């Protein structure tokens, strides 16, 4: 019996090295469409989480979004990407608060970006300034130990695509 649904509105960036994230094009769900989905889920008695998720238009997996650790003139920069990513996340944090959503998941499988601890801590603090519910982050399988800022979120999440025959062992790691 299901009682919780995660809705994942998408943002798009051209490549893994693009700094701008678009979440208002025809290729993304509109706010009105998302609000309709939230209302419908609540009518069914379900609790709702929003997981705004960025993807690359060229098909590169979002885990590979990556830039130089040091700013280099004429190269894409983490600071610009996180500025755009924060705008994207805060848009949905405000919508989540407006709609009475229970949880905001601040990212999904952003493996290369996870090392940017200061930026993630600031993002999560910014989300908390706009949203009163639970805040989570969803890392990729086998990457849980690399996230040094788990203490900043309320719920730890991992995309555990583990073999069924080894499920119990994977839960014990």
Where are these regions (language model features)?
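Short, flexible/disordered intra-domain loops and linkers
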Residues: 17-26, 168-171
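Short, hinge-like loop/turn segments at secondary-structure boundaries
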Residues: 23-24, 66-69, 123, 153-156
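Enriched - but not universal
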Residues: 64, 81-84, 123, 152-153, ...
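Substrate-binding cleft and catalytic face of glycoside hydrolase catalytic domains
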Residues: 3-19, 32-113
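Short coil/turn segments at secondary-structure boundaries
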Residues: 24-29, 80
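Active-site neighborhood of glycoside hydrolase catalytic domains
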Residues: 88, 98, 103, 114-137
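Glycoside hydrolase catalytic-domain groove-lining segments
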Residues: 29-31, 36-47, 51, 129, ...
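Short, function-defining helix-loop hinge/capping sites that tune catalysis or transport
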Residues: 57-59, 117, 167
């Amino acid at each position: 019996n299901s009682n919780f649904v995660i809705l994942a509105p998408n943002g798009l960036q051209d490549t893994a090295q693009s700094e701008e994230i678009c979440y208002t094009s025809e290729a993304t769900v509109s706010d009105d469409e998302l609000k309709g989905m939230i209302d419908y889920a609540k009518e069914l008695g379900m609790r709702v989480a929003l997981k705004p998720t960025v993807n690359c238009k060229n098909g590169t997996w979002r885990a590979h979004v990556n830039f130089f650790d040091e700013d280099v003139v004429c190269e894409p920069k983490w600071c610009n990407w996180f500025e755009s990513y924060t705008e994207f996340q805060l848009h949905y944090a405000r919508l989540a608060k407006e709609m009475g959503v229970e949880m905001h998941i601040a990212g999904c499988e952003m493996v290369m970006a996870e090392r940017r601890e200061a930026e993630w801590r600031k993002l999560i603090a910014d989300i908390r300034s706009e949203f009163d519910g639970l805040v989570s982050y969803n890392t990729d399988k086998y990457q849980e130990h690399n996230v040094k800022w788990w203490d900043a979120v309320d719920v730890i999440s991992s995309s555990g695509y583990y073999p069924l025959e080894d499920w119990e062992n994977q839960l014990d790691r």
